[in-house]
């Protein structure tokens, strides 16, 4: 930041409440110019505060599933820098003469938003786009967004961005590539969701729906849909989790009357 401006930090936006996106704020607040100017506004979706509270309440479980020592995680409310400005669906800000548009859609988390700077045609896509098949199906995590993830991708594809900054990975500065990347990811996720819905309506068991999942070459061979973190089948399981209960459809696993 200091390589481009000496001005104090005016506003900090949390794209979502994950550790790698919201836990480093303390370093920004220690900046001398910012300290002299006063506390910046901390802007986030309303559910970010709920996420922080959840991390405190279930600290041991979170540590286990993140493969982290418990003492590496926050132990009190004072360990977080909490939002001071919250929003629900969307929020427009005017910061230093720049229009900043925040738009919320549940996806990687239920508190995630993307950031659109229309005057610069610049998009911060947060974790909606990750450069590989995204984390919609991690079996160690809580429910991910499904249809809303697809909606967000298609919205972003239609913005006409000439620069896209993902939450992870390299920037893309080609408008046609941005549009293409967002659209094929949306199509891939929608393809999985639609198959799960069709299987449920055909009254198939959950394991049958996953086992029968079709993953065409258009997606399987695409370099930014690589199976790096989760598989298409994992994503199908997360979609099933959204619409069904804990029962796996095997009669002997149902509690006897």
Residue positions per predicted region:
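Accessory terminal helices/loops
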Residues: 60, 158-160, 171-257
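Active-site metal-binding motif and surrounding structural segment of the metallo-beta-lactamase
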Residues: 1-41
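Metallo-beta-lactamase
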Residues: 48-200
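Solvent-exposed loop/turn segments at secondary-structure junctions
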Residues: 17-21, 48-50, 109, 130, ...
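Divalent metal-coordination and catalytic microenvironments
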Residues: 1, 16, 42, 87, ...
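Active-site neighborhood of phospho(di)ester-bond hydrolases with catalytic His/Asp-centered motifs
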Residues: 10-18, 43-45, 123-126, 163-168
């Amino acid at each position: 930041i200091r390589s481009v401006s000496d001005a104090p930090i005016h506003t900090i936006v949390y794209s979502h409440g994950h550790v790698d996106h919201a836990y480093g704020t303390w370093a920004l607040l220690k900046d001398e110019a910012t300290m002299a100017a006063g506390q910046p506004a901390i802007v986030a979706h309303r559910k970010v505060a709920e996420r922080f509270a959840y991390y405190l309440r279930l600290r041991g479980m979170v540590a286990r599933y993140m493969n982290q020592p418990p003492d590496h995680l926050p132990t009190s409310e004072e360990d977080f820098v909490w939002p001071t400005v919250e929003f629900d669906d969307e929020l427009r800000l005017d910061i230093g003469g720049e229009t900043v548009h925040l738009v919320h859609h549940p996806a990687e988390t239920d508190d995630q938003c993307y950031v659109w700077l229309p005057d610069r045609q610049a998009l911060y896509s947060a974790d909606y786009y990750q450069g590989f098949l995204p984390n919609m199906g991690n079996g160690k995590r809580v429910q991910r967004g499904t249809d809303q993830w697809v909606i967000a991708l298609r919205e972003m594809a239609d913005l006409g961005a000439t620069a896209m900054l993902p939450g992870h990975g390299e920037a893309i500065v080609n408008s046609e590539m941005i549009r293409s990347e967002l659209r094929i990811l949306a199509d891939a996720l929608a393809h999985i969701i639609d198959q799960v819905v069709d299987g449920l309506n055909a009254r198939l068991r959950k394991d049958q729906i996953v086992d029968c999942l079709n993953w065409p070459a258009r997606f399987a061979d695409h370099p930014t849909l690589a199976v790096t973190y989760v598989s298409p089948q994992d994503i199908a399981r997360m979609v099933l989790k959204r619409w069904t209960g804990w029962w796996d459809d095997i009669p002997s696993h149902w509690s006897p009357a």
